[in-house]
Amino acid sequence: MDVLELLRASANGCYNTLFSDAWFQYVSKQIATTMYWYGALLVIGVLFIAWFLYFKRLARLRLRDEIARSLSAVTSSGGDHRGLRFRKRDKMLFYGRRMLRKMKNVSGQMYSSGKGYKRRAVMRFARRILQLQRENRPLEMKTVEPPAEYLEETIEGSDRVPPDALYMLQSIRIFGHFEKPIFLKLCKHTQLLQLMAGDYLFKITDPDDSVYIVQSGMINVYICNADGSTLSLKTVRKGESVTSLLSFIDVLSGNSSYYKTVTAKAMEKSVVIRLPMQAFEEVFEENPDVMIRVIQVIMIRLQRVLFTALRNYLGLNAELVQNHMRTKGSSVVPNAVGGAVLAQASQASRPVVRAPTSPNSRLSREEHTLSDPDPNPNANALLFAEVHGDAPYIDLYHHQQQQSSAVSVNQAGTRRSSTTYGPSGESPNGNANTAPGTSIDQRLVQSSAVDSLRRELGLSEDDAQIIEPFVEVRELEPNVTLITEGNAEDVCVWFVMTGTLAVYQSNADATRATKQDSKNDVLIHFVHPGEIVGGLAMLTGEASAYTIRARSNSRVAYIRRAAIYQIMRQRPRIVLDLGNGVVRRLSPLVRQCDYALDWIFLESGRAVYRQDESSDSTYIVLSGRMRSVITHPGGKKEIIGEYGKGDLVGIVEMITETSRTTTVMAVRDSELAKLPEGLFNAIKLRYPIVVTRLISFLSHRFLGSMQTRGSNAAGGPVEANPVTHKYSTVALVPITDDVPLTPFTYELYHSLCAIGPVLRLTSEVVRKQLGINIFEAANEYRLTSWLAQQEDRNIITLYQCDSSLSPWTQRCMRQADVVLIVGLGERSHLVGKFEREIDKLAMRTQKELVLLYPETTNAKPANTLSWLNARPWVTKHHHVLCVKRIFTRKSQYRINDLYSRVLLSEPNMHSDFSRLARWLTGNSIGLVLGGGGARGAAHIGMLKAIQEAGIPIDMVGGVSIGALMGALWCSERNITTVTQKAREWSKKMTKWFLQLLDLTYPITSMFSGREFNKTIHDTFGDVSIEDLWIPYFTLTTDITASCHRIHTNGSLWRYVRSSMSLSGYMPPLCDPQDGHLLLDGGYVNNLPGHLWRYCRASMSIAGVFPPFCDYRDGHLLLDGCYTNNVPADVMHNLGAAHIIAIDVGSQDDTDLTNYGDDLSGWWLLYKKWNPFTSPVKVPDLPDIQSRLAYVSCVRQLEEVKNSDYCEYIRPPIDKYKTLAFGSFDEIRDVGYVFGKNYFDNMAKAGRLGRFNQWFNKEPPKRGNHASLNEYTFIDLAQIVCKLPETYALNTADIFSEDEDFDGYISEPTTLNMDRRRIQVPRAGNSLSFSETEMDSDVEIDLELERKVDKATQSTPPTPNKQHALSPTSSQTNLLPLPPNSKPKEKQPSYDKLDREHKRRQKSKQKQQQERSSMQQRDSMVTLHPATMAEATTQTAPHSSEEDELNKPEQQPEQKPVPETEEQQQKQQDQQQQENLTKTDTKN
C-alpha cells in the first residue's frame, strides 16, 4: 500500500474512502486536547474493577469464618466420640462421594452457568479492554538441520588396497570394466620408475607406447613449440595418469608412433608406475570381447569428452579434424613405383580447401558451393592411387566422364539424385548395368568397392567373400544427403570412390528450432576419393554426430551397421582398423588435448575439489549432478548451487587464478571432463576465437547471476538454491504398497511428453532389454552405459522403483537427480521402514514429497505440516489432484490398455501433473502480484484474462494486496470463488463504523489492527501456507532485522496481514517465530504457517495498522511494499523460469519545481494561497518520507522491468486511490479488459508461446511410436563375441510388467506383438483385482496356440531370409514353433504358472538349458542367413521340453455364479475372450 496516497485520501468521499483530511485533522486535535481525560477515565475504571474484586473476596472470607464457627459449635456440644469408629467401606464411600463432588465442581466451570461464570465474564471484558492475548500457538514446522552427509563429502580410507594397485585400478578405469583375473594379468607388467626433480619421464622421439600413473610426487606435461619455447599443458599429481588413448589405438593396430611435441618432466622426487600398452595385446588375444569393449569406450570418450569440451565450450569445430585423412600406415606407399613423386603430384594438383577455423568466421557457404563439380578429376584419381598404391587401380571417374560425354542435356536432366547397386551389381529394380548416364560395368565397380573396403577394414584377400554380400554402391548427385546429424538408423561406413563428400555439423550455439535449418550448419571437412567416413558412429553405437552431403557427382561404397556387426563376429579385429581410421582423421590439436583432458568418474559423496585448494582446472559435467557448498568461518555450511549435465564448474576461479571458494561434491554417480588450465591457455594462444567464446559464456553467466540475486528463504537451515533447477533423472518411490505408482508414472509421463522426449524405465523394462542378469556386478558397464545413453537422448528419464529394496531400486537411487516420494494425502503421515531405507541410500539427493488426492474429494489439503515434520529430509512438497482412473484398482493388463489410449490424447497443461512436469524440467511459470491497496482488484481481472489466454500458473507470490489476492487463488483455483471472496473482503473495508471502533492511541499506529485481522482471518481461516494447492510465498519487511522476509510456510492470514501493515496506520506484525517486527514488504520489493497470519503481515501498513509480530521468532513484520513491491526476482530464485509480474502500485510525480539552492516555507505558503501565481510542485514532509521508504523498491522495480525472464504488466488504474475499496467491480473490469487485450496482442506477435508452449511435438499416432530397439546402446563385445546373454524366459515373462500393445507409446521398449496375444484371457479369472487373483504388477505373456500338422513335424522349418535380416525380428515369439512341440490345450492359470516358475528356479540345470536355447533363438535373427537353419535345428529339442513344462494339468473349469450386474458383465467379457481364443486356435 502507499503511505502518501493514504494520507491524501479524498475529502469528498466519491470513492468511498475511509478517511478524509477534515476528519483526520478534527480527530487529531481532539486527541491532543482530551488526552488527559482519557487517561483519567482509564485509571478510574481500573480502580473500580480492583475495588469490586477486593470486596467480593472479603465477603467470601467472612462467609468461610462463619461456617467454621458453626461447625466448631456443633462439635463441642456433641460430647466425647473417641470410642466411635467407621468401617472401611463407609470411609471409602464417604471419600468417593467427596471426590465426585469436587470433580463436578471443576467440570461445571466449563459451562456457561455455575460457579465461576461471573468471573469469566469479567475476564473476557478485561481482555477486550486491555487487549490481553491468550496463548494459542499453532503447529510449527520443525527446523531440522540436514544430515552431515548432505553438505559434506565422503572421506573413506583405502587401507585394504595397496596404493599402487588402487591408482592402477582408478587409471585403467578409462578403458572400461575389467574382471579381477584380467586386472591381475595387467599388474604383472607394471614397472616402478624412480624420478628425481628435473628428470624426464618421456621426451620427444621417445616411443609413445605406455600408460604412466603417478604414485607420488608431481609431473609436469608441456608442449614444445617449433621455436624452442615450451608451454605447460597440465600438472599430474598423485593418483593421476598420463596417457593418450589415441596412441593406444595406434599401438594395438601396429602403427606405434613417437612423442612429437609432448614432454613430461618431474617437478619433484616422484614415483611413477609404467604400464606398457603391449601388455593389453596378451589380454586381448585371450579375451577378444575385452578388446572390442576397450575400443568402444575409447571412441565414446573421444566423442563425449574431447568433442564436447572443445566444440560446445571452446567453439572449435573444423579445427578438430584434418581436411585430408592421413594415409593408412604411411604417407608414401612403398610398393608403388614412383609413389613419392605420385604423392607430390597429387598434392600439387589437388585444390587446397581450408576448413573454417570457427563457427562464426570462418568460411561462408558461398565459398563452399556444394553444386560445384570437382575441379580436377585427375587429382582424385591420383589420391585414390596414393591410398592404395598396390591395388589394381581403375580410373572410374575419368572413365565415366568419357562415356557420358555423349549424353544429351535432356537425358542428364532426367537423372535421379542417387542410384544404389547391390552386391551383384544390380539396381533395385532388378536390371543389371542400367545405371542412368553411365555404361561402366557395375560388376567392375562392385569388385573395386569390395577390394577397397576390405583394405580399409584390414582384411586379407581371402576375407573378401565375407564382406562381398554386404557391400553396396551408390551414385549421388550434388546436395544429396547421405545421413543427418542425430540419425541412428542410417549409420554406415562410407568409402568415397569418386567425387567429394562434405561433412557438416550444427552450430553449438544454435537453438532447437534453428538446428533444423541446414543453413546454420558449419562445414567441418571434405571426404575425398579413397577416404572413409562413419567409423565413429559405428564404434560408439550412437547416432551420427555429423551431416554428410555430396559436394559433387560422386560414387560411394558403403556397408550398413548391421552388416558390420556380422563381419565383426568373424573378424573382431576390424574394430582396430575402424578406430584407426577415425584417429587418422583427427588433427594434431586433438592428440595434444588427449594428453591433457581427463575423464573422471565420481561416486556419490566424492569431492571434485575442496575449498581453499588451488584452482588449476575446470570441469564439465557429462552426466550426474554436483553440489557446491561453502563453509563459513563459524563452521556453518551453505549450499551455493547445484550443477547438472552440461554445466561448467570452476571456470571463474581458474581464469582469475584464485583459490577455490567452495567445495564441489557429487550428489550421485557422475562423469566429468577435466580441462586443465595449461591446455586452456595453449588453445587460447593458438585459436584466439576461444577467448571470444569464453567471454560470451562468462557474460551470460554473470548476467544471469545478477538477475537472480535475492535473499534467502526465512527459517531454513539451508538457503535457497540460486541455480535454476533442471533435473535429468527422477526416481519415483511409493510410501506404501497401496500407492498407485504405475498410473501416477504414466500420468507424469503423459504430461512430460508435451515438453520434450521422455523415457519411463522399470526393472522389467531393463531386464527385457539387457537380460535378467543385468543388475549383477559383471554387467555394470553395460547397464551404466545404456542408462547414460538413454539420459542423453531424453530431457528427463523416469525411474519407477520397485516396492522393495531391490537392486533396481538401489540403482534408481544412484541414478536420480531428485527423488519423488509419492503418498496418499488422506492417509496417515507416518514414515515406513522402506522410506527410511531410501533416505539412507540417497542422503545427498534432493527429495520432494508428492501427496495425491482424488478428484472427487471436496476437501482441501490439510495436515501437510505433519507430513513434513515427520520427514525432515524433504525439501519441497507438491499437492496433486488426480483423476478417478488413477485410484481405480485394475490389473496391469487393463492399466496398460487404458493408458495406451490415454497417451494418444493431448495432456491438460493446467493439471497438477503438468505443473509438476514443468517444475522438474525447469519450465515453471510464476505469477507475481504487486501491492497497491484497492487497485489490487485489478489482479482479479488479470487472473481471469490469464486463465482465458491458456497460461498455466505454477507458482504465486504477492505483496500487500497482491498477497491477499494470490493466496485466494492458490487456495481456491476457481476464478468465481476468488472473485466472490475478494468482493466480500473489499466490502468489509468500506464499513467505516467498524474501523472507528478499532481506533487506538496513535503511539505505534492509528488502529489496533484487531478488526483488520478479523477480516483476513474470516477470509482464510486457520490455513497454513503448506496446505495451498499451488506453491505460494509472500514478502514482508522485517523491521527487527532490517531486511525483507520471504514466507513459504506458516500461518497464511498472519503473513498476509503483515505484508499489508503500512507504516503509521497499522502496527507491525510480530513474528511468532523470532519476535521480529514485520511491515509491508513493498518497502523493499513490491513484486514477490497458518495462512492468514502471513497475509495479514504482508498488509501491515505502517502507521495505519500495528506491525504484526511473527508467532515463530517474535520479529515485527510490516507491509512488503517497503522493500520489494513486485518480487519477480524472488520468484525467479525460487525456480520459476517464466514470470508474469503485475504492478498496481502508485507512481510518484517526477516533474518537480526547481526552486534553487534554498527554499522558504513562507514562499510555498504564498504560492499555495495566491490564485494569481503559477503553482509549484515541491514534496512535503510525508511525501519525502514516503519516497525515502521506497528508494530500494524503485531500484528493484527497474531491474525487474529490464530482465529477460519477466513479463512486466501495469494495468491503467492510476486514477483510483489506494483506499477506493468501494470501486472493486469497476477496477476489476479495467484489469480484465486490459489483460485480455494485452495477451491477445502477445499471441498475435508470437510472444505467448513461452508461457503455454515448450516443445513442438506432433500428436502421437497409434503404431508409430519410438522404440528403444530402434536406437539403443550397442555393446559390441556382446554382439561380436557371442557373450552369454540372458533373456527373460517365457515363464519369466509372466512377471514382466510392460507388454507391447499396438499404439502403446509410453513404453517404447519392444516392438508390436501379435494382436492375438492381447486377446488371450487368464484362465478362470477376469482382468480385475476385484476377484481373487495374484496381486502383481505384471501381465501374462502366453504362447499362442498353434496346431502343427503331423506331416510337417519331422521337417524343420525353413528360415525366411528377409525375416532373418530384419532388425525388427529379434523377438523370440516371432520365430517358428519348433517341430517337436505340441499345441497347448488351454492357458495355465496364475497359480500354476507361479508354481512352474518356482520349480524352474530351483532346477539350475534346466534354467541354464533354457537360457542357452533362448540365446540361440536370438542369434538366428542377427546371424548370417546360412546359419539360421542350423540354429533353428539346435533349438527345437529343448523347445519341446519347455512346452512340456509349460503344459498345465487338466482340471475342470469352474465358473462362478453371477450374483450382481458387475459380475455378470465380467462373465460375459470372459466368455467373449474365450471365444476369440478358440477362433485363433482354429486359425
From Swiss-Prot:
* InterPro entries named among the record's database cross-references: Acyl_Trfase/lysoPLipase (IPR016035), cNMP-bd_dom (IPR000595), cNMP-bd_dom_sf (IPR018490), LysoPLipase_patatin_CS (IPR001423), NTE (IPR050301), NTE1_P-loop_dom (IPR056556), PNPLA_dom (IPR002641), RmlC-like_jellyroll (IPR014710)
Q: Region Disordered: which residues?
A: 348-380, 404-440, 1349-1483
Q: According to its UniProt record, what is one Pfam family this protein matches?
A: NTE_Ploop
Top-level EC class as recorded in UniProt: hydrolase
Reaction equation(s) it catalyzes: a 1-acyl-sn-glycero-3-phosphocholine + H2O = sn-glycerol 3-phosphocholine + a fatty acid + H(+)
Biased composition of type Polar residues is found at 413-440, 1351-1373
Motif GXGXXG: list the residue ranges: 931-936
Positions binding a nucleoside 3',5'-cyclic phosphate 1 in this chain are 174-301
- Residues in PNPLA domain copies: 927-1093
Q: Where is this motif: DGA/G?
A: 1080-1082
Which is a GO BP term held by this UniProt record? Answer: ensheathment of neurons
Domain of life the protein comes from: Eukaryota
Modified positions (Phosphoserine) are: S418, S424, S1174
Where found?
Endoplasmic reticulum membrane
The residues listed in the UniProt record as binding a nucleoside 3',5'-cyclic phosphate 2, with positions renumbered to this chain, are: 456-585
Primary location group: endoplasmic reticulum
The record's EC number reads 3.1.1.5
Motif placement: GXSXG:
958-962
Residues reported in the UniProt entry to bind a nucleoside 3',5'-cyclic phosphate 3: 574-701
| Keyword Phosphoprotein annotated | yes
Task: Specify residue ranges for compositional bias: Basic and acidic residues.
Answer: 1382-1396, 1445-1458
What does the record give as the function of this protein?
Phospholipase B that deacylates intracellular phosphatidylcholine (PtdCho), generating glycerophosphocholine (GroPtdCho). This deacylation occurs at both sn-2 and sn-1 positions of PtdCho. Its specific chemical modification by certain organophosphorus (OP) compounds leads to distal axonopathy. Plays a role in the signaling mechanism between neurons and glia that regulates glia wrapping during development of the adult brain. Essential for membrane lipid homeostasis and cell survival in both neurons and glia of the adult brain.
| Entry's family note | Belongs to the NTE family.
Per its record, how is this protein called by name?
Answer: Neuropathy target esterase sws
Species per Swiss-Prot/TrEMBL record: Drosophila virilis (Fruit fly)
Species lineage: Eukaryota, Metazoa, Ecdysozoa, Arthropoda, Hexapoda
